[in-house]
Amino acid sequence: MTTADLLCAARAVKPAAAALSTAEKNRLLEAMAQALLDHADNILAANAADVEAARGVIAPVMIDRLSLSPARVESMAEGMRAVAALPDPVGELLSETARSNGLVIRKVRVPMGVIAIIYESRPNVTADAAALCLKSGNVCVLRGGKESIRSNTAVVAALRAGLEHCGAPGTLVNLVEDTSRASAAHLMEARGFVDLLIPRGGKGLIRACVDSAKVPCIETGTGICHIYVDAAADLQKALDIVYNAKTSRPSVCNAAEVCLVHRDVAEAFLPALAARLAGKQVELRLCPRAAAVIPGTPAGPEDFDTEFLDYILAVKVVDSVQDAAAHIAAHSTGHSEAIVTEDAAAADAFCAAVDSAAVYVNASTRFTDGGEFGLGCEMGISTQKLGARGLRFPVNQKAPGPARQAFAAAVRIPLFPRCRRTGWLSGARRRK
């Protein structure tokens, strides 16, 4: 099937997707989750072929993104069931106002329509995107990377089997099997067929979509995430947080790429950090002040503007909270930043000065995740400010409602007129 034919089929099933009841959507999600487990052998065999073909072609750390295991397939199924358990956003009444002229004005949530997702080598995104689109009454068109085409094909075949077992059209979930740039460009330009485009991947992919798309596009930014260790930090807590944020899964966008350390604790903290990260063979790229304390690779100017997605951490010594915030303003992609401190005033100053989608106090940047926020899997992390910022879920949110307020404690959400809410996540320090 050509991309044009696929888009026609997706558009044709839009009314059916929007008309599904909550019970019907949840039943389909449960069936799709079970189908993933029933077809796990096929999915894992296809994935093994993808991984074998990718070895020597993509970086070893990126193989982790591509790889599936029985546990990861089980996690994909659990994610779909978690989405089924979420409240149905469609039809939610956000506000109601009676006007003096007799009009009753209501704000409600409605589906977007056809959502196209362009992503790279993460087969789990296929299941996550399908689940979120179905729950929100949308049709999805998925276009993954060439490295994962076999895996994605097997996953979509399983999901469609689950849909069709329940009598629903398989075209609720669609996969573009053409992984050429032409197919991606087709989606970017498909006005009248694609109601929303979400790119999820590296800097080049996202920039291409933002620059070229003729359809509405949500920018899901790359993650140059910072952790600032303050003069008033609990240094053991700081070690745990930096270790988790850098090493638990370095190939994901919420992993830390830069550690900023206050000059007053640099001599005590940096040797301990180097020793802790040595076990994971993390390469430290050091500013001159950090290099005067511990050995490592001298940092070049580009190292503080790079999303490494690898066992590499750029380290800089700073003079104050304000100095840290200024560095972040100059180099951050606006994804997730954290401060480790026991000083409430320093934490408040950091949160007020840092302009990113998620800001943490005494917590790992790895918490920027829909599951960790209790909201199920997310479509992506938006770093843009107009209309959509932070964790993104495919429903047309026409006003700030409970779904936004639920995670406003950690995520900056611009409203209109623009205001932001921030807060503390001081209880949980690490994400496993």
Stretch-by-stretch model annotation:
Residues 18-19, 231, 317, 340:
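A structural signal for short, well-ordered beta-strand elements
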Residues 300-432:
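Conserved C-terminal structural/oligomerization subdomain of aldehyde/semialdehyde dehydrogenase
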Residues 121-124, 128-136, 158, 165, ...:
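ALDH superfamily catalytic-core signature
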Residues 85, 93-236:
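Rossmann-like NAD(P) dinucleotide-binding subdomain of oxidoreductase/dehydrogenase enzymes
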Residues 22-27, 90, 166-173, 248-255, ...:
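Flexible, glycine/charged-enriched surface loops at secondary-structure junctions
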Residues 1-107:
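N-terminal Rossmann-like NAD(P)+-binding subdomain of aldehyde/semialdehyde dehydrogenases
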